[in-house]
């Protein structure tokens, strides 16, 4: 009786060992197959990252040693963050007065919006040349990003289906009329105005500081209606 029990225990242990060995082998083959499938993707991804790193230009650190005028609308960061998380540049605080309630109900002639631009690649300098802006550059083996703080006219979203030529973004800057303007006697539209800021650019394979033009405000442009049109009213 004891011998029969021992034989059964030996057979059960052998069967369990075979099952575990087969499961381990199947798992190893599955892992190897998955690694074989993922290896081309990882290789292609690493190859793309390597190619992207090669395209980032290297900047001489001496360019940042000179103390020159720097615009608050230009920021250099070695932490690549989203433009929405950057916030707005610091502005002087305005102390409120007791008669501030008298100014309630005032509206801007044109609505504007402010945002950070981190993918600016081309711009116009003071000489009218089309220069290449460096959105990324390497300095002291550290990759930094160049960000610009722009103010543009707010784009109105169309009600219903967009008109041909407008797309999903709505009315373009320069096509919306100004607020509070008498349309019987005046033609008006909101448009972007520009300012020049000092940025790191490349022109004719030479990296240097140059003043480039970016959007800085949204203003109203007026033009008087024709004399005949005015006589009708």
UniProtKB/Swiss-Prot annotation:
Keyword Secreted applies: yes
SUPFAM superfamilies reported for this sequence: Cystine-knot cytokines
Secreted in keyword set: yes
GO CC terms in record: axon; dendrite; extracellular space; synaptic vesicle
Annotated compartments: Secreted
GO molecular function: growth factor activity; nerve growth factor receptor binding
Annotated Pfam families: NGF
Propeptide: 20-97
Principal location listed in the UniProt entry: secreted
Keywords attached to this entry: Cleavage on pair of basic residues, Disulfide bond, Growth factor, Secreted, Signal
Family: Belongs to the NGF-beta family.
Name this polypeptide is given: Neurotrophin-7
Organism: Danio rerio
Name of the gene encoding the protein in the UniProt record: ntf7
């Amino acid at each position: 009786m004891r011998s029969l029990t021992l034989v059964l225990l030996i057979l059960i242990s052998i069967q369990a060992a075979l099952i575990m060995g087969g499961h381990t082998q199947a798992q190893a083959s599955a892992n190897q197959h998955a690694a074989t499938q993922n290896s081309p993707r990882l290789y292609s991804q690493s190859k793309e990252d390597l190619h992207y790193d090669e395209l980032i230009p290297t900047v001489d650190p001496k360019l940042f040693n000179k103390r020159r005028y720097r615009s608050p609308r230009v920021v250099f960061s070695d932490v690549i963050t989203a433009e929405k998380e950057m916030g707005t540049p610091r502005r002087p605080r305005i102390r409120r007065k007791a008669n501030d309630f008298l100014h309630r109900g005032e509206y801007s002639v044109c609505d504007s919006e402010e945002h950070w631009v981190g993918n600016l690649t081309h711009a116009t300098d003071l000489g009218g040349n089309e220069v290449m802006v460096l959105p990324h550059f390497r300095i002291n083996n550290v990759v930094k990003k160049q960000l610009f703080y722009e103010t543009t006219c707010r784009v109105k979203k169309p009600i219903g289906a967009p008109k041909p030529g407008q797309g999903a973004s709505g009315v373009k800057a320069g096509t919306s009329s100004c607020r509070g303007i008498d349309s019987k006697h005046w033609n008006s539209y909101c448009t972007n105005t520009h300012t020049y800021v000092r940025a790191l650019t490349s022109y004719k394979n030479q990296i240097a500081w140059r003043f480039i033009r970016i959007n800085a405000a949204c203003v109203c442009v007026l033009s008087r209606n024709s004399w005949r049109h005015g006589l009708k009213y």
